[in-house]
From Swiss-Prot:
Membrane-spanning segments: 29-49, 58-78, 103-123, 137-157, 200-220, 241-261, 275-295
Residue pairs linked by disulfide bridges in the UniProt entry: C100-C192
Coiled-coil portions: none
Name recorded for this polypeptide: Olfactory receptor 5P73
Length: 330
């Protein structure tokens, strides 16, 4: 039941997601592609977390933050992808009122945390390159924990603002959302009540997060580039810059896509283009992050080789012992 009679009012109890396409063949193809991406996302980020936990050489502030970034990437993808895959299977694109609020609230929470973690990693690179002698003090274990906890608190606050704004709205008419998941902007268009307060509150919250994190990232990298340009040897410049390329790539992908979705005027691109960008933002980027950080980071690659080598060596020893005992019993 999509509507509930409440006295003289009709209340929406569920929303209908128009999804990505109506073509049944294309839906099946998209299901397979997105399922594969989701499996790679979860396995890749879990592998990153486990590798950082078990590798003593990766027990540094940057990798501590990276492990939380990997957890958040799983959260962002999981807030949208499982429900989207389910709609592909059951051919039923409805989501309950509460389910809709949970979906966009979790997306807002994890998206906010990712913004602050990316800003924290930029600050980490700034201290490492511009103030290396103070690195152990400014990026101590206690400082890292405080920065990460602060990121989660900001995520909780922003998600709370969006949740309270959502429950202050009244839905009595159309319930069709032209998207594949419950985003806050399309919900505002469906509301029968005045959305001014909700728009102001969420805009201030999202604006504060965006401006704060972009400011920290911009200032950090400005100082980093100035410091790198002052280095005398080309080798030192390349080495310093190589420590930033992975993070800078992740920042450009994340914020670049977010700007197109939430900042650019809707008239500048079509709804279908917006859906593609949203897929990239919520599904593809969480898969790319572990690849970006692992393929361009020598310490992670060395740790991965070392642990894979140990596994191969231990399995080889086990095979040899089994083979020896089988052929030459005592």
């Amino acid at each position: 039941m999509a509507f509930l009679e409440d006295g003289n009012h009709t209340t929406v109890t569920e929303f209908f997601l128009l999804g990505l396409t109506d073509d049944p063949v294309l839906r099946d193809i998209l299901f397979i592609i997105i399922l594969c991406i989701y499996l790679v996302t979860v396995s890749g980020n879990l592998s990153t977390i486990l590798l950082i936990r078990v590798s003593s050489q990766l027990h540094h502030p940057m990798y501590f933050i990276l492990s939380h970034l990997a957890s958040v990437d799983i959260g962002i993808s999981s807030s949208v992808t499982p429900n989207m895959l389910a709609t592909f299977l059951v051919k039923q694109n409805t989501i309950s009122y509460i389910g809709c609020s949970i979906q966009f609230t979790s997306a807002a929470f994890f998206g906010t945390v990712e913004c602050f973690l990316l800003a924290t990693m930029a600050y980490d690179r700034f201290v490492a390159i511009c103030n290396p002698l103070l690195y152990s003090t400014k990026m101590s274990t206690e400082a890292c924990i405080q920065l990460v906890v602060g990121s989660y608190i900001q995520g909780f606050l922003n998600a709370s603002f969006f949740t309270l704004s959502f429950f202050s709205l009244f839905f009595c008419g159309p319930n069709r959302i032209n998207d594949f998941y419950c985003d806050f902007a399309p919900l505002l268009e469906l509301s029968c009540s005045d959305v001014t307060v909700a728009v102001v509150i969420t805009s201030i919250s999202a604006g504060f997060i965006t401006l704060t994190t972009v400011f920290v990232i911009a200032i950090s990298y400005s100082c980093i580039f100035i410091t790198i340009m002052k280095m005398h040897s080309t080798e030192s410049r390349c080495k310093a810059f190589s420590t930033c390329t992975s993070h800078l790539t992740a920042v450009i992908l994340f914020y670049g896509t977010a700007i197109f979705i939430y900042v650019m005027p809707k008239s500048s691109y079509s709804t279908d283009q917006n859906k593609v960008l949203s897929i990239f933002y919520t599904v593809v980027i969480p898969m790319l992050n572990p690849l970006i950080y692992s393929l361009r980071n020598n310490e992670i690659k060395e740790a991965l080789k070392r642990h894979l080598g140990k596994k191969v060596f231990s399995y080889g020893n086990l095979f040899c012992k089994t083979h020896y005992n089988h052929n030459y019993p005592v």
